[in-house]
Amino acid sequence: MDKRPSIIGRMFDRIAPTYDLLNTILSFSLDKAWRRAAINLLEIRAGDTVLDIATGTGDLALPAADGGGKVVGIDISRQMLLRALGKAEEQDLLTRYSVVQGDALSMPFRDETFNSAMVAFGIRNMNNLEAFLAEIYRVLSIRGRFSVLEFSLPERSLFRWIYVAYLTYVVPIIGGLISGDYDAYRYLRDSVTGFPVPEALEGIMKGQGFRVVLSMPIFGGISHLYLIEKR
């Protein structure tokens, strides 16, 4: 898989118009509750500065901003950011949500800028996990927390087989038909099945200086929620 930022950015530019619709369809609307759980873990207080990585169309950032946080979203895709800003305007959240187009491995923020950070379904798109986590560590304040929501693979063999079959045969067809981009949804399958298992990802997180506060499978293990803290 080619995870160069330029390639990922162009892919998300192409699927941006149907991104929210397909998230709802392919997750059976479960992704909204999962995102809310990721936000709640951070216990955001009024005035906290929060970084949302791979902010996309703002589905994680906007509820956090609505809860009182001052959220900065970064994403490599301009088209995704334009949709996020449109939704922020509709929800009257532009005073609490701003965006930056850029690479999450080299962010234009000073050290210890943010009280907390979060990412939903974006960490698997990073082409260097160690460098990405080091960059998050840099921009977080001491004891700052980072919540990570990402797809995973169920441990139970039957459920795992069903889920992989869904990713292999159903997701690319539905995603391709609606978005017009079959390759993007084949990439989704490959990026999920090729991503480190939770125990391996926890090891990478610890290797970059984080303390793992929580690591929890969701919905039988098709997604996983992590909360880590800067020491």
Language-model-derived ranges and their functions:
Residues L105-S116:
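A short acidic, Gly/Pro-enriched loop at the edge of an enzyme's catalytic core
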Residues N115-L129:
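A short SAM/SAH-binding and catalytic strip from SAM-dependent methyltransferases
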Residues T18, F28-D48:
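Conserved alpha-helix/loop element of class I SAM-dependent methyltransferases that forms part
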Residues G209-R211, P217-R231:
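Core SAM-dependent methyltransferase catalytic element
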Residues L149-I204, Q208, L214-M216:
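C-terminal alpha-helical "lid/dimerization" subdomain adjacent to the S-adenosyl-L-methionine
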Residues E130-R145:
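A short glycine-rich, Lys/Arg-flanked "PGG" loop and its adjoining helix->strand segment in the class I
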Residues M1-T18, L167, I178:
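N-terminal, positively charged/glycine-rich alpha-helical extensions of SAM-dependent methyltransferases
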Residues T49-I53, T57-S106:
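Class I SAM-dependent methyltransferase SAM/SAH-binding core
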